[in-house]
Amino acid sequence: MIKSRIFKKGSSNGLSLTEVGFGTAPLGNLYKPISDSEANSALEAAWKSGVRYYDTAPLYGLGLSETRLNRFLRTKLRDEYVLSTKVGRLMKPCGESNRTGHGKWFEVPSRQEVYDYSYDGVMRSIEFSYERLGINKIDIAYVHDLCIFTHGSKQASDERIRQFFDNGGYRAMIGLRDQGVIKAIGGGINEWEVCENLAQKGDFDIFLLAGRYTLLEQEALDTFLPLCQKRGIKIVTGGPYNSGILATGAIEGAF
C-alpha cells in the first residue's frame, strides 16, 4: 500500500497526503475522450492501491473532471481522503464553437475559461467547485497558472501575479484558510521561479510544481526548495515523469 505523510504547518489543520496522488486532468478528456466508466475504474484502481490524495481544477474538462470526481468521492467517507482544486479561472457557458480547448478537451461542456484572480473571482470559483464536486469541504486550494507557460511572457505572468495580490485574490484565499473553509493554500504552477516569487510575497502552505522538478530538471534545488524547507512550505510534484523521455529516449514533440 502507498504510504502517507503528515503535513502540518504551524496550526492544528494537519493534512495526511499519500506519497502518490491522483491528478485528474485526464478525467476531463484531455487529448482524448474517455467514458464515465473508464474514469471511475481508474479512480477505483487508485483507491484500491492506497491513493488518498486527489487533485482537480475547474479547467480540467471545463468542469467535467470535478463532476466525475463527484460521482466517485460520494461513495467514500469524507475524512478518508484529501482533495485539492484550483482558483483563477471561471467557466462561463457559451456556444460550442466558442468554448475553450478545441483539440485539447474532448466531449466536454460548452464553457469558456475567463481568468479572474480577484477576490470575487476566487470566492465564486470555490463556490462553483463545491457545486460540481458535490461536497462540503475542500482541503487545499491552489491559485492556478500564474505562470509564463500559460500567459505567454514574464511580463504577462507578472501582471497576473499583481492582479492576484492587488485585486484581492490572495486576501480571499487567506480568509478562506483563516475561517477553516479550506485547510491549506498554495499555487499550482508550471515554473519553480513563479512559485519562488509567490513564496516571497505571501504566506503559502504548499505548492504543486507541475512537471518542473524531475530527474532531468533539478534547478529548483538551488534556491526554491531550500526556501520552502526553511519556511515549512510543502511541495507536490505534478508529472514527476514528465514526458517519459528517460524510458523512451528522445522523441519528436517531447516536452
Each model region followed by its residue ranges:
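Active-site groove signature of glycoside hydrolases
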Residues: Y130-Q155
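Active-site beta-loop-alpha junctions enriched in small/polar residues
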Residues: A25-L27, A57-L59, K86-L90, V143-L146, ...
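Beta/alpha (TIM)-barrel catalytic core signal, keyed to glycine-rich beta->alpha loops juxtaposed to Asp/Glu
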Residues: I6, E38, L146-F255
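Short, flexible, mixed-charge acidic loops at enzyme active sites
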Residues: C94-W105, G249-A254
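Conserved, mostly hydrophobic/aromatic
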Residues: F22, A39, A46, Y54, ...
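Short, acidic/polar
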Residues: P33-A46, S118-R132, N190-N197
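Active-site mouth loops of central-metabolism enzymes
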Residues: A25-S37, E107-M123, D158, F255
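N-terminal binding-site loop/beta-alpha segment at the start of enzyme catalytic domains
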Residues: M1-E96, K104
